Amino acid sequence: MPTIQQLIRKPRQPKIKRSKSMHLQECPQKRGVCTRVYTTTPKKPNSAMRKVAKVRLTNGFEVISYIPGESHNLQEHSVVLIRGGRVKDLPGVRYHILRGVLDTQGVKDRKQRRSKYGAKRPK
């Protein structure tokens, strides 16, 4: 416990809050180009083949981002838009790819939560 005199000489420093999606640099979304599209397996209690892509952003960073929804049309050199948001059971995946924007198609035959997956309203 510091004395009052010590606090006058050197005041307390506020704690710095670090961003969980620092590569976006305070932007809501960032554009990038896919350098590799592949599947990976989740952490221990879960089992699946999760679709992920390595994306080189316009600011030069290279990040791993998750491709949500069933099936996708992404391949190398596809231009995508990413947002923040981690995938809990995939270590190192801190971003999501937005569906229905730029080169990414929306999820086909999606009826509910369509706006999250870039799907048009069914007729």
Curated annotation (Swiss-Prot):
Source taxon at top rank: Bacteria
Family: Belongs to the universal ribosomal protein uS12 family.
Function: With S4 and S5 plays an important role in translational accuracy. Interacts with and stabilizes bases of the 16S rRNA that are involved in tRNA selection in the A site and with the mRNA backbone. Located at the interface of the 30S and 50S subunits, it traverses the body of the 30S subunit contacting proteins on the other side and probably holding the rRNA structure together. The combined cluster of proteins S8, S12 and S17 appears to hold together the shoulder and platform of the 30S subunit.
UniProt keyword annotations, A-Z: Methylation, Ribonucleoprotein, Ribosomal protein, RNA-binding, rRNA-binding, tRNA-binding
Start-end of Basic residues biased regions: 9-21
Protein name: Small ribosomal subunit protein uS12
Residue span of region Disordered: 1-27
Spans through the membrane: none
Cellular component GO terms, alphabetical: small ribosomal subunit
PROSITE patterns: RIBOSOMAL_S12
GO biological process annotation, one example: translation
A Pfam family this chain is assigned to: Ribosom_S12_S23
Gene giving rise to this polypeptide: rpsL
UniProt-recorded Gene Ontology molecular function terms: rRNA binding; structural constituent of ribosome; tRNA binding
Modified positions (3-methylthioaspartic acid) in chain numbering: D89
Subunit structure: Part of the 30S ribosomal subunit. Contacts proteins S8 and S17. May interact with IF1 in the 30S initiation complex.
